[in-house]
């Protein structure tokens, strides 16, 4: 029994001593390649597969990932905000009895007591339309907002064009695997 245990321990130790094939050395990532067509596509898959592409990006851009992780998300609950009384402000024709019932009901709901309100703004349809119009960007060119967003999709277009330039460069001149990983992975 003890010899079998030692044999299993030896096998386990040998497995642990083998280098992990998903990790990539610096020399391999900085290696200069010159490939075209299918070979380029296969190399792209090999570079971006498993953890290879993530390794190339993680070594050069840890601050970018940290900045994305610490992005501030606005909270809807603000303990210093005024009580939630927009119903009473928007409906001036309510009787005093209904206003009293509404204020008592709102006071009994703790989740409504800390909701922020727009105290100085006048809620009107025209103001809402103007705000919506400005936010969608129709004020500049008069075109519908959907068309504007389709026309302003320059980030993905630039990425596609730079990808084509990278494949041509790798075919004619050559490029490093790290530059491919930065562009595609």
Swiss-Prot record:
One of its GO terms (cellular component) is extracellular region. Disulfide bonds join 36-171, 48-185, 170-175. It is found in: Secreted. The keyword Amino-acid biosynthesis does not apply. One of its GO terms (molecular function) is hormone activity. Residues 58-156 form a propeptide. Residues 135-161 are annotated as: Disordered. Residues 1-22 form the signal peptide. Keywords: Cleavage on pair of basic residues, Disulfide bond, Hormone, Secreted, Signal. CDD domains: IlGF_relaxin_like (cd04365). Belongs to the insulin family. Heterodimer of a B chain and an A chain linked by two disulfide bonds. This is Prorelaxin 1. It comes from Mus musculus (Mouse).
């Amino acid at each position: 029994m003890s010899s079998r245990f030692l044999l299993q321990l030896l096998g386990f130790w040998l497995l642990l001593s083998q280098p992990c094939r998903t990790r990539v050395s610096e020399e391999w990532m900085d290696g200069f390649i010159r490939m075209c067509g299918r070979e380029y596509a296969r190399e792209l898959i090999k570079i971006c597969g498993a953890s290879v592409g993530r390794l190339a990006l993680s070594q050069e851009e840890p601050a970018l990932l940290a900045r994305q992780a610490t992005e501030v998300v606005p909270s809807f609950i603000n303990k210093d905000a005024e009580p939630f009384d927009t119903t009473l402000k928007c409906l001036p024709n309510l009787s005093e009895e209904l206003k009293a019932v509404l204020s008592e009901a709102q006071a009994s709901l703790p989740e409504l007591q800390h909701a922020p309100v727009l105290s100085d703004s006048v809620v009107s349809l025209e103001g809402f339309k103007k705000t919506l119009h400005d936010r969608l960007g129709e004020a500049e060119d008069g075109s519908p907002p959907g068309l504007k967003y389709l026309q302003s999709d320059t980030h993905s277009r630039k990425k596609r064009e730079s990808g084509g330039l990278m494949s041509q460069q790798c075919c004619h001149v050559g490029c490093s695997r790290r530059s491919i990983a930065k562009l595609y992975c």
